[in-house]
């Protein structure tokens, strides 16, 4: 039999018969590893212990201590176990797909009766019974005709459709435990008992169209979460409880920031309080960009399809665009326009006005650009996933030699912004060349090297995402980690030599000839709407004082203090503090509770003593104790706190 060489993580290599399985490799290494092994990685691919290895490869054997692989297997197995449990309880249910997602999995079912929240407990109980049976998980590769016949005989039309969509040269792999079977690429654990029965929970039920197509069958989706141990599950559930308290939709109502309504799906109605946050943040970003050498522009929101065709967006992005047909002066053909889904083609039009020299580069162009993108109604989520939004968009037109310095400069800019907004924990990911791409390997080498060098120059490490770049260039992604451990990808920097070529951007080089600039698409916040949602949840509504829409409420304890209340408000406003009076005929405790729910950072209570002594009683949000201070000292302190950090 032919021999193959398997190389282990420590660099050692061993020879084996071709067709050996990772389970057999683990047994060859040690009896202990054979018992603990759950899967392998073979040449970078997660590999089932039962799959044969037929050629030379790098191999690593995984155990439950390898959390990434263990979680994937546990969640994948639980998707199958849940589908089996559902069909054992309700045999007429048809199964579709059940992928692993972040922190868990889901499975879509076609069932006449709707699932209820009470059903989740019943399903969980049945799942634990299956786990406790410790039945072996086996796999077979079937011929296409056999698989289609099997699913046709068992009245599983969705599986038949899935098989029809699988490329003909791809093997059809079937996984079994007990007498239940599913079409699946794998990998899986070796028996159901390897799944921790106390570390999973079914979370919710939702509707989902088959294959995401609203013209197809509406299915029922059950979501679950799972981890390698019950303590991790407990921590995750605690995090979800905290996330519910911080939900920007809930806090948005309590703070009277915004609302959404059916007549404008995916678009925000900003209330005065919310718009104050928006404009304060935008003013801050405008000053920061101006300081960093950006020129601000404003471009049309409705643009003829001709530009989108030329830029390539019409072919690649049309389904996400809002199309507008206009009868121009009763012309024979209606003009076809689109609300812009992004600003970059318009920025190239601005760049193209007038002759540009190499001395004009780098040219940093910024716009708070209003964009519109179609999102399915089921994907909309408060102000974090919308159809109408404003980007803090920017495009740097530069030479290839300037990519590193401009990227390093942007990283420093982004770092300052995130710190000012209360985010100190963030990471950088570098997405490299995909298989389908334009440009030579040398060009990609240079672009990727430039981004990596920029990160190092700015003093930051980065993670490489192999093959995740756009077809026209690599990119950096900047991901925030919030107070409860969730990750939010916000900032980006994308290298692009394609759009300047398509839209004929050029500058005159030192040699007197025309050259194409490189475009660096960059954003710090992403969109104002989404970032404000993240800010609200990060700070649980207790925004940094300078961003708070209502910074101070001066509340009267007695009506005899009303005049002094108004005087205090005017004094604070004159010092640049957003202050308002509350002289309603209500008890002070009621006022304090109401304004605390509204996340007002500071409440100043004023009664007889404060009037006589020209003081105020200071209560800060989240603190139970009050402190009496002079109006002069409080005004000075709050004026400083109300000053945006870039102006200090």
From Swiss-Prot:
Gene Ontology cellular-component terms listed: cytoplasm
Species per Swiss-Prot/TrEMBL record: Ruegeria sp. (strain TM1040) (Silicibacter sp.)
GO biological process terms held by the UniProt record: threonyl-tRNA aminoacylation
Lineage of the species this protein comes from: Bacteria, Pseudomonadati, Pseudomonadota, Alphaproteobacteria, Rhodobacterales
Subcellular location: Cytoplasm
Annotated binding of Zn(2+), by residue: 344, 395, 521
Name this polypeptide is given: Threonine--tRNA ligase
Function: Catalyzes the attachment of threonine to tRNA(Thr) in a two-step reaction: L-threonine is first activated by ATP to form Thr-AMP and then transferred to the acceptor end of tRNA(Thr). Also edits incorrectly charged L-seryl-tRNA(Thr).
NCBIfam families assigned to the protein according to its UniProt record, in alphabetical order: thrS
Positions of disulphide bridges: none
TGS domain location: 1-63
Keyword Zinc: yes
Region of interest: Catalytic: 247-544
Family: Belongs to the class-II aminoacyl-tRNA synthetase family.
């Amino acid at each position: 039999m032919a021999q193959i060489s398997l190389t282990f993580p420590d660099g050692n290599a061993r020879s084996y018969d071709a067709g050996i399985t990772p389970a057999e490799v683990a047994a060859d290494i040690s009896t202990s590893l054979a018992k603990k092994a759950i899967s392998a990685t073979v040449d970078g691919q997660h590999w089932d212990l039962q799959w044969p290895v037929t050629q030379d490869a790098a191999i690593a054997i995984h155990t439950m201590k390898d959390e990434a692989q263990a979680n994937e297997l546990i969640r994948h197995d639980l998707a199958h176990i849940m589908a089996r449990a559902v069909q054992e309880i309700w045999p007429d249910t048809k199964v579709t797909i059940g992928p692993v997602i972040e922190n868990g999995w889901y499975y879509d079912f076609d069932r006449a009766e709707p699932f209820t929240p009470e059903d989740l407990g019943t399903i969980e109980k049945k799942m634990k019974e299956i786990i406790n049976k410790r039945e072996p998980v086996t796999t077979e590769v079937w011929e296409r005709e056999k698989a289609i016949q099997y699913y046709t005989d068992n009245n599983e039309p969705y599986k038949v459709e899935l098989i029809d969509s699988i490329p003909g040269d791809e093997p059809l792999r079937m996984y079994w435990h007990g007498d239940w079977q599913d079409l699946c690429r794998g990998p899986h654990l070796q028996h159901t008992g390897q799944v921790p029965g106390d570390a999973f929970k079914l979370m919710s039920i939702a509707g989902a169209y088959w294959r995401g197509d609203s013209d197809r069958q509406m299915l029922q989706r059950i979501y679950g979460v799972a981890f390698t141990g019950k303590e991790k599950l407990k921590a995750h559930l605690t995090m979800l409880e905290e996330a519910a308290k911080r939900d920007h939709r809930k806090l948005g109502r309590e703070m009277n920031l915004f609302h959404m309504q059916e007549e404008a799906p995916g678009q925000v109605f900003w209330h005065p309080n919310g718009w104050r946050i928006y404009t304060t943040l935008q003013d801050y970003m405008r000053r920061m960009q101006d300081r960093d050498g950006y020129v601000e522009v404003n471009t049309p929101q409705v643009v003829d399809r001709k530009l989108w065709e030329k830029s390539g967006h019409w072919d690649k992005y049309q389904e996400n665009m809002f199309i507008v047909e206009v009868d121009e002066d009763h012309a024979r053909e209606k003009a076809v326009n689109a609300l812009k889904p992004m600003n970059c083609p318009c920025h190239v039009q601005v760049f193209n006005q007038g002759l540009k020299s190499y001395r004009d580069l780098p040219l940093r162009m910024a716009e708070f650009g209003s964009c519109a993108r179609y999102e399915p109604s089921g994907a909309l989520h408060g102000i974090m996933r919308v159809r109408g939004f404003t980007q803090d968009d920017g495009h740097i037109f530069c030479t290839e030699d300037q990519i590193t310095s401009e990227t390093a400069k942007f990283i420093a800019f982004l770092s300052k912004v995130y710190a000012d907004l209360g985010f100190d924990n963030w990471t950088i990911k570098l997405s490299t060349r995909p298989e389908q791409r334009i440009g030579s390997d040398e060009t990609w080498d240079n672009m990727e090297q430039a981004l990596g060098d920029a990160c190092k120059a700015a003093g930051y490490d980065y993670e490489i995402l192999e093959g995740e770049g756009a077809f026209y260039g690599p990119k950096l992604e900047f991901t925030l980690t919030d107070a409860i451990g969730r990750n939010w990808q916000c900032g980006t920097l994308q290298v692009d030599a394609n759009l300047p070529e398509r839209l004929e951007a050029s500058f005159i080089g030192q040699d007197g000839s025309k050259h194409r600039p490189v475009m660096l698409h960059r954003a710090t916040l992403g969109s104002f709407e989404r970032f404000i949602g993240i800010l609200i949840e990060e700070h649980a509504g207790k925004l940094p004082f300078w961003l708070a829409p209502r910074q101070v409420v001066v509340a009267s304890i007695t009506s005899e203090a009303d005049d002094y209340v108004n005087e205090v408000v005017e004094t604070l406003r004159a010092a640049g503090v957003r202050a308002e009076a509350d002289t309603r005929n209500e008890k002070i405790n009621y006022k304090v509770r109401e304004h605390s729910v509204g996340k007002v950072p500071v409440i100043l209570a004023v009664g007889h003593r404060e009037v006589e002594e020209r003081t105020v009683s200071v209560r800060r949000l989240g603190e139970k104790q009050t402190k009496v201070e002079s109006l002069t000292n409080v005004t000075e302190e709050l004026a400083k706190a109300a000053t945006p950090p870039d102006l200090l």
